[in-house]
Swiss-Prot record:
Gene Ontology MF: a single term: indole-3-glycerol-phosphate synthase activity
UniProt record similarity statement: Belongs to the TrpC family.
Keyword Transmembrane: no
Keywords: Amino-acid biosynthesis, Aromatic amino acid biosynthesis, Decarboxylase, Lyase, Tryptophan biosynthesis
Enzyme Commission number, as recorded: 4.1.1.48
Catalysed reactions listed for this entry: 1-(2-carboxyphenylamino)-1-deoxy-D-ribulose 5-phosphate + H(+) = (1S,2R)-1-C-(indol-3-yl)glycerol 3-phosphate + CO2 + H2O
Organism: Chlorobium chlorochromatii (strain CaD3)
Highest taxon of the lineage: Bacteria
PROSITE patterns per UniProt: IGPS
Pfam family for this entry, one: IGPS
Descriptive protein name: Indole-3-glycerol phosphate synthase
GO terms (BP aspect): L-tryptophan biosynthetic process
Pathway given in the UniProt record: Amino-acid biosynthesis; L-tryptophan biosynthesis; L-tryptophan from chorismate: step 4/5
Matches recorded under CDD domains: IGPS
Lineage: Bacteria, Pseudomonadati, Chlorobiota, Chlorobiia, Chlorobiales
Amino acid sequence: MTYLDRILEHKQIEVAALKKEQPRQRYEELQAELEAPRNFSASLKRPANKGVRLIAEIKKASPSRGLIVQDFDPLAMAQRYQELGAAAFSVLTDQQFFQGSNDYLRQVKGAFKLPVLRKDFIVDALQIFEARLLGADAILLIVAALESSQLRDYLQLSAELGLSALVEVHDGAELDEALQQGATILGVNNRNLKDFSVDINTSIKLRPSIPSDMIAVAESGLKRAADIDAVNAAGFDAVLIGEGLHISTELRSLIWT
């Protein structure tokens, strides 16, 4: 069983518990009481003559690396990343595999003005309603984790709720699927979710196949200034970086604004 298989199997258990805790109808009723989401999509648009925008990830651990940040403080981390010039935050909410928390997202959203992406593995529409209630401005939809009909329906639902959707792909077939189902923000994950191996050439090879009017995001494995130069030259609008910002003084020294 792959990493992704194990994660998705556990997500189904989480969703079953979520449905018992609060039915979809109640989530739908609560939407009217919320403030409008911040514009995640607009925050990623690359200004003329500027470099890629930074989505800074608030991440404590991962299945492949274990604990990444010993003294984890999501607000302190977000503050550092905002000072670096981040355009948006990505907050891990998966608890079982990444030691994330819904509370981390709430805290970051409440303390800062930047748009916030809920980074999790969505397998059910109820998780999208939940993301909206948590204060997320955007969600992650992983093509490898969803059927075609799910991807299409979840893109439509997120739009109805005012949420941006970062649609993640890893190869050409997944990219074609994302485009066919109506994605407008494309994330190319350099990490293979089956075995968690990383190759940053994945994003560079796929970039020419992403329409120029879409927002293109390079994700995972970016740890050196040379990596940023490469995806910058390839024409990406933004990068999503978590562990790299924590461990690399090179990345932290770059000018992101």
